[in-house]
Structures are given as C-alpha cells and as structure tokens.
Curated annotation (Swiss-Prot):
NAD(+) binds at D50, A51, E52, Y53, D54, S99, L100, E132, R155, E192, K308, K332. Signal peptide: none annotated. It comes from Bradyrhizobium diazoefficiens (strain JCM 10833 / BCRC 13528 / IAM 13628 / NBRC 14792 / USDA 110). It catalyses: NAD(+) + (deoxyribonucleotide)n-3'-hydroxyl + 5'-phospho-(deoxyribonucleotide)m = (deoxyribonucleotide)n+m + AMP + beta-nicotinamide D-nucleotide. Zn(2+) binds at C437, C439, C461, C467. HAMAP family: DNA_ligase_A (MF_01588). This is DNA ligase. Its EC number is 6.5.1.2. Keywords: DNA damage, DNA repair, DNA replication, Ligase, Magnesium, Manganese, Metal-binding, NAD, Zinc. The lineage of its organism: Bacteria, Pseudomonadati, Pseudomonadota, Alphaproteobacteria, Hyphomicrobiales. One of its GO terms (molecular function) is metal ion binding.
Length: 716
C-alpha cells in the first residue's frame, strides 16, 4: 500500500546495521523480492532489470552473512522463483529445480572455489569446472520415459512448475524421441528456452503491425510465447532451446558435467557451443572476461557465466545449501546505470509495519527494462549516511526533483548510487519521514533503537492489526501462491473486499459464500453470477491445505517458507505444532528446547512464535480459521534409508568428511540434523574431541555411533 509523505533520511551500509535494523530490512527486502519473483516467473513482466534484482539479493545475502541468526525463509536466499500461476496444470519436480548463487566480483569466484576445496578436503585447488554463458530465458525441465517426451514443465517455485508439454512439442530444438544408445528409462533434461535478438525484433514488428502487445525484451517474449493456451501461437514464435542440466535420471550415462553436455548433443539436443572446460580459477575468470567482450555480438541475451564442478560425484558430495547448490555459481556481468529525475517519494507500509521510502522516477530504460521505482531504504540512506555511519555519495542527500544515477546491479527496485548536484533545481525538496502512519488512523510511528540505545533510522507503525495497511498486507500473503493460493483473489479484488468490509481476516474469505445472500457480490460492477460462482469454487478448493503452507500463511515474523517447512516436518501435524506454540508462548522451557532442537529453528523464530501466539487477537484469528479449513499433516521423508525421519547430531571432529558434508548427506537421506542433543534425538555421531553433546547423549540414553559406524549405516 503506497501513501505519500514528506521529507526523509538515508540508508546504512551492511557493516553499520544494528541487529534491530538488520531484522527490519531483511523482512522488507524479502517482501520486495517476492513481488518481483511473481512478476518475473508468473507474469513474465518484470519491472526491474536483472542487475537491480541481483543487487537486492546481494544486499540481502550480505545482511544474512553478518547476522546469521536472522536467516529466515522469507529471505531471497531461501526461495526459488515463484509458485505456478494456475493457468496450467501443475507438475511436481521429482528433483527440485533450484537456482544458482551469484558472484559479482573475481573475489567471489575465488571464495567459491575455496569453499569447494575446503568442503571436499582437497590438498589444492586443482578442480575442473565447466563454464558456459548464462542464457537469459525461461528454465525448462523435459521428462523422457522410454526415450519418449512425456512432460515439459517450467521451473515455477522450484518444487512445482506448469505443464507446457503441448507448447514445447512445437519447438524444433526439442526432440520428441531421444537418439543414441544408453538412454536411461527415466531421463529429465533441463535447459533454457530463449529467443534470438533478431527473432525478437521481427516478432515485435509483427506485434506492432497487428496492434498487439510489444514485448520488453527477448526473455519476456520467450516466456510469453511459451505460456500460451493455444500451442499454435507458440509454434508461430521462433523459440530455441539449449540443454545444460538434468533432473531425475534412472541411470547416469556420463561421469562429468561436460560429458553430459556431449551426451545431450548425441541425444539430439542443441547445447551452447561456447561451453568450455576450465582447470583453474584463472581460467574461469579469463573465460568470463572473454564472454563479456563477445556479449554484444551474440544473437541471444546472456547476463553472466555459469561455473559448475565438472565431476558429478563431487557435485553429489557437495550437495545444496537451502535454495542453491554448493557446486555451481553464476558469475554476473557488471551492473548498468542511467540518469533520470526523482519525481516524488512515497512511503510504503509493510506487513510488519515498517516504513520504506520508494522513489518515483521519470521512466528510464536500464539494460532493456523500463525502471519507474527505486528503493530509498530509510532516512539515513536519503541523507547520505551508511549503515555504520559512513558517508555515502560523498554526503550528497537525495531530494525530490533531483537528477539521480540509478543502477541495476541487483536491488529488486534499483538503487540510487549518486545525485547530480549540477542538475539540482532550486525547487528541489528535502524529504522528511511522517510522524504518523499514512494510513487513515494516523497511528504513531516508533523508531527501532540501535545497539547503543540510540534512535535508529528505521521507522515502524505501531498500529499492528489496527493499521489497515498492515492488515491488507497480511491478507495478501495469506492468499498468495506460496500460501493458500486462491485464484480470483488478486490484489485488486482483495483490496476491494477489504475496503468494503467483506474480508477483514483470513476466516472471512471462507465465509463469503455463506454471507453472500446479504453481500450480493454478483451485483458488484465487473463481477456477475459466473464470476462469483468461480470465485466461490476457487475458495472451496483451497479448504484443504498442507501444514507447511498453513504455517507460512499465518504471516508470523521470521517464519517464511523454509522455516515453515522445517516446523511442519518437525511436528508432523497441526495439533502437535499448535500445542507446542501455545506452550512456547507461556514460556514452557521443555517446549522451547524441543523447538530449538529442530533444524533451522533458533531463538529468533521461537521468540516470534511466542509473540504471535501470546497475543489473544492472533489466537482468535487462528481459532476461527481452523474451523474453516482442513490442515493436512506434513509429508514423511521420501527415503528408504536407515536414517529417514530420524534426528541426528554430529559432535567432535570428523575425519572422512567435513561437518557440512555430513549434514548434507544426512538431510539428503531424509534425516533431520540438529545442533543440540535432547531426549528426542535418535542418533549422535561422535568423533574425536566430542564433549558435552556426547555426555548429553549418554544421559538421555541416545544411541552413539563412530564416524565409521555412521558411514556403514548409510551405506557410504
């Protein structure tokens, strides 16, 4: 919800952020990223450039690195893409389609290689990597059974995509039947659907002549062409496909990444001819520099270079961290900049009440995307002060009317990197934060204190559920794709229902049909009987929901998708989770210890849950909601291993694998890895130097294994 305000203050560097400021900014950035993910992955209509988006993720990751205790699932580091749009049948990926972490400087690449060397406990950095241009297109997974194409699905949110099989069959680059020998019975080939620059220009000429929509860039045109209900439209569009990865495979035909690339070619796929095998960090960086120099001459858009560990067995050992693999990284190209005029500054009130100043720009093209909004972070940032009190932009403040330099290096909404003082008009106005919330209630504004007890730069509305801006943001999260995923209740419809008083809390959505005799929604302009019936049907179809989605939909601070999933798997059922939450809210030490023992759950999340369920208003909302829906128990780990579903603790020194590798292996086999021992712990793997955790295991009678016994148990 946007509202105009007056003057304002600037933003701080990550190194200067206090814990309180970091917590607030992480939540704000997470919400921004969610909106941009939806516009990019679902709507094929991004409002920011890739560089701007990357900058946002950079800042978010930097804050999380400095404050690891604040890592939550709402962080961009915990998410992949966006949930399927609902226009196509949903397809669950047998192997998740995760995204790569980003590198923006040579030092990032060196750190990436160093982490791999340490993880694998290698004596040197002599590792082979495949290197290839990062195509700016639409990720696709093609499933073949018995050599025949059976399903084509988009990335979606990484776990679930959209079925676009009929459309994919129209692409010449996608074989209907795989060629060659040693083709596995089940084979998922992954790659990128793209459109060449030449084809993009020709398509836009035809669109313009026909009076149809003009696409912003080749990526949007490729995505829009593929996600057509009518396959003949897709067939008329010149789309290409590069194969570069795989998902579920009943057998691996090759032992290396580059070997798989050649195997794809033998099967009938096109692969990027610029792919190379590199043997050192220096070769990786040299390849990046060469591709950047050749970038303008290529007939397709790229936004960086991808590096992957070549040995597949090493990829499997390295595994994943949340949403990204340890064995791969995308080395992005430098950001692009442009100058434009800052026309106004508006205050955005987030779901948690935090104020974010958003600059409204004279529209300007940056890297092929029209940019109209820019995040100004907080008061200090606007004043030219960084997070640690350092000077930004040589002390130049930002005023309404200024000519500013914006950069699309990664901020979801681009960032202002400078102000052109020579162009500052006499009418330029300083911006000051409002003293009250811009909502109709004009509730008071509070400031989060710094670690030194001083007033911070982050402003927050104190109205909480009384503030209509916060209420509506909670409802938007509730109906979002990652939560209840209710079709027909978009932002505009939900805002209308909220303004009219039809929906004030989540349970109201499920009682709309009962109340419609009085509300008469079909008489509202733009609705009609058919639209209302469809809406009620969509709502009815969402009365049954998975536990992890329900927990996420509650909108508790610091409980995003990843955390919600960890809680759901930890407790199994709503009854068990709800009971634990009520006990935690009352300060029950045993309940808090049990929750703390869950993977990815720490003090910050526990406090947030305690605060939420300690508030009677929230308990009432939950009670009314649970009367309207059925909450499905969490799925059990899909693994036949001896440790599936067990809670494991590693302690002491491990000699045959790193601690990270041991944790990744256990989780891959369906186990839960905890950092502390409790009576609910199933196994403790103890190496030399094991101390208090081993003592706790003996105290609780928990089974203790040596490293060799652990490896034998898991069959490695």
């Amino acid at each position: 919800m946007m509202a105009r305000a007056a003057k304002s203050k600037p933003l701080r560097d990550v190194a200067e952020l206090t814990k309180a400021q970091a917590k607030v900014e992480l939540m704000r950035l997470a919400l921004e990223l969610e909106g941009h993910d939806k516009r990019y992955y679902q709507d094929d209509a991004p409002t920011v450039t890739d560089a701007e988006y990357d900058a946002l993720r950079q800042r978010f990751n930097a804050i999380e690195k400095r404050f690891p205790e604040f890592v939550s699932a709402e962080s961009p580091s915990q998410k992949v893409g966006a949930a399927p749009s609902g226009r196509f049948r949903k397809v669950r990926h047998a192997v998740p389609m995760l995204s790569l972490d980003n590198a923006f400087a040579e030092e990032d690449v060196r750190d990436f290689v160093g982490r791999i060397v340490r993880f694998l406990k290698l004596d040197d950095d002599k590792i082979d990597f495949s290197a290839e241009p990062k195509i700016d297109g639409l990720s696709m997974s093609l499933r073949y059974e018995g050599g025949e194409l059976v399903t084509a699905a988009t990335r979606g949110d990484g776990a679930e995509g959209e079925d676009v099989t009929a459309n994919i069959r129209t692409l010449e680059d996608v074989p209907q039947k795989l060629k060659g020998r040693n083709v596995p019975d089940i084979c998922e080939v992954r790659g990128e659907v793209y459109m060449t620059k030449k084809a993009f220009l020709a398509l836009n000429e035809r669109q313009k002549a026909a009076g149809d929509t003009i696409f912003a860039n080749p990526r949007n045109s490729a995505a829009g062409s593929l996600r057509q209900k009518d396959p003949t439209i897709t067939a008329s569009r010149p789309l290409g496909f590069f194969a570069y990865a795989w998902g579920e495979m009943s057998a691996m035909p090759e032992e290396t990444q580059t070997g798989m690339i050649h195997w794809f070619e033998r099967c009938g796929f096109k692969t990027n001819p610029l792919t190379r095998l590199c043997h050192s960090v220096e070769e990786l960086i040299a390849f990046h520099q060469r591709i950047e120099e050749e970038r303008a001459e290529l007939d397709y858009d790229i936004d960086g270079v991808v590096y992957k560990v070549d040995r597949i067995d090493w990829q499997e050992r390295l595994g994943f961290v949340s949403r990204t693999p340890r064995w791969g990284i995308a080395h992005k190209f430098p950001a692009e900049q442009a100058m434009t005029v800052l026309r106004d500054i508006e205050i955005q009130v987030g779901r948690t009440g935090s104020f974010t100043p958003v600059g409204k720009l004279e529209p300007v093209g940056v890297g092929g995307v029209i940019v109209q909004n820019v995040t100004l972070h907080n008061e200090d940032y606007i004043k030219g002060i960084g997070n640690k009190g350092e000077v930004l932009r040589e002390g130049r403040d930002i005023r309404i009317g200024d000519t500013v330099v914006i950069q699309r290096a990664g901020d979801v909404i681009p960032q202002v990197v400078d102000v052109v003082l020579d162009k500052r008009p006499k009418t330029a106005k300083e911006f000051h934060f409002p003293k009250t919330c811009p909502c109709p209630l004009h509730t008071d504004v509070t400031r989060e204190e710094t670690a030194a007890g001083e007033e911070g730069s982050r402003a927050r509305c104190t109205g909480e559920f009384a503030c209509p801006y916060q209420k509506i943001e909670h409802l938007k999260l509730f109906v979002s794709r990652r939560a209840f995923d209710i079709d027909g209740l978009g932002e505009k419809q939900l805002q209308y229902f909220f303004d009219e008083g039809f929906v004030k809390e989540p349970a109201d959505i499920f009682t709309l049909e009962k109340r419609n005799a009085k509300l008469k929604l079909e008489e509202i302009e733009g609705y009609g009987a058919t639209s209302v019936r469809n809406l009620f049907a969509a709502i009815e179809s969402r009365r049954r929901i998975a536990l992890e989605r329900f927990v996420y939909a509650l909108g508790m601070r610091h409980v995003g998708e990843t955390t919600a999933l960890a809680l759901a798997r930890g407790y199994g059922s709503w009854e068990a989770f709800h009971d634990a939450c009520l006990k935690v809210a009352k300060g029950d030490e045993e309940a808090m210890a049990d929750m703390d023992a869950l993977d990815q759950i720490g003090d910050t999340v526990i406090k947030s849950i305690a605060d939420y369920f300690g508030e009677s208003h929230n308990r009432g909302i939950v009670e009314r909601l649970t009367k309207e829906v059925e909450i499905v128990d969490a799925e059990k780990p899909k693994s036949n291993s001896a440790v599936a579903g067990k809670t494991v603790v590693f302690t002491g020194s491990l000699e045959k694998m790193t601690r990270d590798e041991a944790k990744a292996t256990a989780e891959r086999l369906g186990a839960k890895v905890s950092g502390s021992v409790s009576k609910k712990t199933d196994l403790v793997v103890a190496g030399p130097g094991a101390g208090s955790k081993l003592a706790e295991a003996n105290k609780h009678g928990v089974k203790v294994l040596t490293e060799d016994e652990w490896l034998k148990l898991i069959g490695e």
